[in-house]
């Protein structure tokens, strides 16, 4: 399991790791601060990160059973914190 931020979504415990590079590249405008993420983009980013630790996670089931209006921002912030914390702790590490 990849280290990250612990988070409870829909009554399930998850560890939200940093986003994979492919996700960062896909949503570069969000990660570089050139655009604000839409709700759909936030959900996609959260799912991409969690999929690293939970490969059997299904996106539709995850969005229907775990994400909701009350926790999407929290989940997104946990993923973003995990992504920036990893970068700050290990600068230049490949």
Listing of model-derived features with the role each one plays in the protein:
Residues 38-55:
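A short, charged
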Residues 1-13, 21-37, 54-94:
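Charged interaction scaffolds used for protein-protein
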């Amino acid at each position: 399991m990849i280290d990250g931020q612990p988070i409870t979504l829909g009554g399930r415990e998850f560890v939200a790791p940093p986003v994979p590079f492919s996700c960062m590249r896909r949503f570069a405008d969000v990660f570089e601060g050139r655009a604000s993420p839409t709700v759909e983009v936030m959900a996609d980013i959260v799912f991409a990160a969690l999929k690293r630790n939970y490969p059997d996670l299904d996106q539709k089931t995850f969005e229907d059973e775990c994400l909701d209006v009350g926790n999407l921002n929290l989940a997104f912030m946990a993923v973003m914190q995990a992504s920036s914390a990893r970068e700050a702790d290990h600068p230049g590490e490949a």
